[in-house]
Amino acid sequence: MFVSAARVLLTTGLIGLIPACMSVPVTSLPRLAAMDPVSMDANQIEVAVRAPDDFDLPEDGATLVLTVWQEEGDETREELFHLQPVPGSPTEFLTQRTKAGFSIHRMRVDPKDAPRMDEFRAHMLSLKETPGQKSLSVSVTTRPCLKPGANPFKDPRIAIYLRPTQEEDYFTLVKERSVPIELPGGDARYCETG
């Protein structure tokens, strides 16, 4: 049996990794624990990020990271899935979480990565028969960029929501957290223009 764990990370640039598992609301823990890693479908999973209007999520701005660990042999396998924008209106859940001065970015796993998700799922299924404990870690990383003219001295406050299937609604994965925008060289990450 798999144990689901939420090790949620927000990150900007290569530094500023913030373990945000402390920011996972208690009410979201049962939803995380109920996620069935064997039946996860890349075409179904959606992530939403609420960020200040002064920031954007570029094409490489958000990643879903799934890590499975097995006690037998102390083996770990990790898969990173880059997320792309999802067209359409926000769900009622997301609409209720809109705030003045913030935008909600809906994203999903790139459909071309569906075969990798299928391979990852097959790997997890093969572990079912293996003795010992197994665990699944779900992480979301974000790398927002600063829009031209925005204040580079104010770190963005970001919230992350997860939607495991299209039949379910989103739930809060990470409450609003401040994320440093400064890159290792000391500069802010600016959005590309034109």
Question: Where in this protein do the model-derived segments appear?
Answer:
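Structured domain cores in non-transmembrane regions
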Residues: 56-136
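Beta-strand elements of well-folded, non-transmembrane domains
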Residues: 51-55, 68-72, 142-146
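C-terminal motif of bacterial Sec signal peptides marking the signal peptidase cleavage site
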Residues: 17-20
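Post-signal peptide N-terminal segment of mature Sec-exported envelope proteins
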Residues: 29-52
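Bacterial N-terminal signal peptides that target proteins for export
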Residues: 1-10
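Bacterial signal peptide processing site
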Residues: 22-25
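Glycine-rich, aromatic-bearing surface loops/beta-hairpins
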Residues: 128-194
